[in-house]
Swiss-Prot record:
One of its GO terms (biological process) is innate immune response. Keywords: Adaptive immunity, Blood coagulation, Coiled coil, Disulfide bond, Hemostasis, Immunity, Innate immunity, Secreted. Conversion of fibrinogen to fibrin is triggered by thrombin, which cleaves fibrinopeptides A and B from alpha and beta chains, and thus exposes the N-terminal polymerization sites responsible for the formation of the soft clot. The soft clot is converted into the hard clot by factor XIIIA which catalyzes the epsilon-(gamma-glutamyl)lysine cross-linking between gamma chains (stronger) and between alpha chains (weaker) of different monomers. Forms F13A-mediated cross-links between a glutamine and the epsilon-amino group of a lysine residue, forming fibronectin-fibrinogen heteropolymers. A long coiled coil structure formed by 3 polypeptide chains connects the central nodule to the C-terminal domains (distal nodules). The long C-terminal ends of the alpha chains fold back, contributing a fourth strand to the coiled coil structure. One of its GO terms (cellular component) is extracellular region. This is Fibrinogen alpha chain. Heterohexamer; disulfide linked. Contains 2 sets of 3 non-identical chains (alpha, beta and gamma). The 2 heterotrimers are in head to head conformation with the N-termini in a small central domain. Signal peptide: none annotated. The lineage of its organism: Eukaryota, Metazoa, Chordata, Craniata, Vertebrata. The gene is FGA.
Length: 18
């Protein structure tokens, strides 16, 4: 859930824009 998360977290929890 980090604003600078990786693709995995980005797609899973919608973290950062990567």
């Amino acid at each position: 859930t980090d604003p600078d998360a990786d693709e995995g977290e980005f797609l899973a929890e919608g973290g950062g824009v990567r």
